[in-house]
From Swiss-Prot:
<dbReference type="InterPro" id="IPR001329">
    <property type="entry name" value="Venom_Hyaluronidase"/>
</dbReference>
<feature type="active site" description="Proton donor">
    <location>
        <position position="135"/>
    </location>
</feature>
<feature type="glycosylation site" description="N-linked (GlcNAc...) asparagine">
    <location>
        <position position="125"/>
    </location>
</feature>
<dbReference type="GO" id="GO:0005576">
    <property type="term" value="C:extracellular region"/>
</dbReference>
<keyword id="KW-1015">Disulfide bond</keyword>
<comment type="similarity">
    <text>Belongs to the glycosyl hydrolase 56 family.</text>
</comment>
<feature type="glycosylation site" description="N-linked (GlcNAc...) asparagine">
    <location>
        <position position="105"/>
    </location>
</feature>
<keyword id="KW-0326">Glycosidase</keyword>
<feature type="disulfide bond">
    <location>
        <begin position="211"/>
        <end position="223"/>
    </location>
</feature>
<dbReference type="InterPro" id="IPR018155">
    <property type="entry name" value="Hyaluronidase"/>
</dbReference>
<dbReference type="InterPro" id="IPR017853">
    <property type="entry name" value="Glycoside_hydrolase_SF"/>
</dbReference>
<dbReference type="GO" id="GO:0030214">
    <property type="term" value="P:hyaluronan catabolic process"/>
</dbReference>
<dbReference type="GO" id="GO:0005975">
    <property type="term" value="P:carbohydrate metabolic process"/>
</dbReference>
<feature type="glycosylation site" description="N-linked (GlcNAc...) asparagine">
    <location>
        <position position="153"/>
    </location>
</feature>
<feature type="disulfide bond">
    <location>
        <begin position="45"/>
        <end position="334"/>
    </location>
</feature>
<feature type="glycosylation site" description="N-linked (GlcNAc...) asparagine">
    <location>
        <position position="351"/>
    </location>
</feature>
<keyword id="KW-0020">Allergen</keyword>
Length: 357
């Protein structure tokens, strides 16, 4: 009980600006209600006779009947027919809708998108948070590294075939220009259509704005400088989003301080972007209750408290608790998650919301 009291006292002091450590920079944000959402497919646990009705007891907004696509929040995975290179075996891939944005058919995509939306969530009066989760490629050409590098290579090959006598720099520059022009078109028009057909909902793309902190090439809390500059140039996207949805999943391999730094940097960047926009979209951080690199292990009570605390003191408007279908695909997993909710996650959530609000 003493630990809970101390945690609440410290949190309230930070929220009210009475105390802030040397590494803390309180973000200037208008006073808002702090909300926590449940975005976990726990409906899958119903088949085992386990229900998560207690979620709302902890001041967590929970879809009616535990629906995954519900009245409070709905996430749409890879909706429509975005251009993509879908991986097959032996390094091969299947080309979907042109493979890359500059080769794609936007009309077909938008038609498939609205069909998908109407099928998965037909209620056009939806007034919750609508999340578009598209992670095949990023609209900034440079940011397509790792598994996404295939999109850069594919784009470069297209230009090289057209202009075999151009030098490497000219080819890459043209590939980048074409890719980014049409990537913007696909992402922007998709968002506009979602807003047009579900006008009461708050829409945003999962993960944006990106920060790329605590990564191999930028192993510090602050966001990559180039990424910040690129975020500044993405007002075309953020001006259309009602909510910003940075991802703050933490890894077990990081030290406790590094985990805090990861959350701090990403929330601060999203708040910075929000503060630059006239409509000041709310910032809801996507948060996972397990470690990203050790998905069978729940976050410790300390990590839950500290990550929630960082989201609050750096100006976030709330948290979206996310979970994978693989987290709840057996009786034992459902039982463990429910116990974790009742004993660790839930009590911390209610303490944080009451302290802030």
């Amino acid at each position: 009980m003493l630990l809970v009291t101390l945690f609440l006292f410290f949190l309230q002091a930070l929220v009210n600006g009475d105390s802030c450590g040397s590494n803390c920079e309180k973000s200037e944000r208008p006073k808002r209600v702090f909300n926590i959402y449940w975005n976990v497919p726990t409906f899958m646990c119903h088949q085992y006779g386990l229900y998560f009705d207690e979620v709302t007891n902890f001041n967590i907004k929970h879809n009616s009947k535990d629906n995954f696509q519900g009245d409070k929040i709905a996430i749409f995975y890879d909706p429509g027919e975005f251009p993509a290179l879908l991986p097959l075996n032996y390094g091969k891939y299947k080309i979907r809708n042109g493979g890359v944005p500059q080769e794609g058919n936007i009309t077909i995509h938008l038609q498939r998108f609205i069909e998908y939306l109407d099928k998965t969530y037909p209620n056009r009066n939806f007034s919750g948070i609508g999340v578009i989760d598209f992670e095949r490629w990023r609209p900034i050409f440079r940011q397509n590294w790792g598994n996404m590098k295939i999109y850069k290579n594919f784009s470069i090959d297209l230009v090289r075939k057209e202009h075999p006598f151009w030098n490497k720099k000219m080819i890459e520059l043209e590939a980048s220009k074409r890719f980014e022009k049409y990537a913007r078109l696909f992402m922007e028009e998709t968002l506009k259509l979602a807003k047009k057909t579900r006008k009461q909902a708050d829409w945003g793309y999962y993960g944006y704005p990106y920060c790329f902190n605590m990564s191999p090439t930028n192993f510090v809390p602050d966001c990559d400088v180039t990424a910040r500059d690129e975020n500044n140039e993405m007002s075309w996207l953020f001006n259309n989003q009602n909510v910003l949805l940075p991802s703050v999943y933490i890894r077990r391999e990081l030290t406790p301080d590094q985990r805090i730094g990861l959350v701090q940097g990403r929330v601060k960047e999203a708040v910075r972007i929000s503060n630059k926009l006239k409509h000041s979209p709310k910032v809801f951080s996507y948060w996972w209750y397990v470690y990203q690199d050790e998905t069978n292990t729940f976050l410790t009570e300390t990590d839950v408290k500290k990550t929630f605390q960082e989201i609050v003191i750096n100006g976030g408007d709330g948290i979206i608790i996310w979970g994978s279908s693989s987290d709840v695909n057996s009786l034992s997993k459902c039982t463990r998650l429910r116990e974790y909710l009742l004993t660790v996650l839930g009590p911390i959530a209610v303490n944080v919301t009451e302290a802030v609000n």
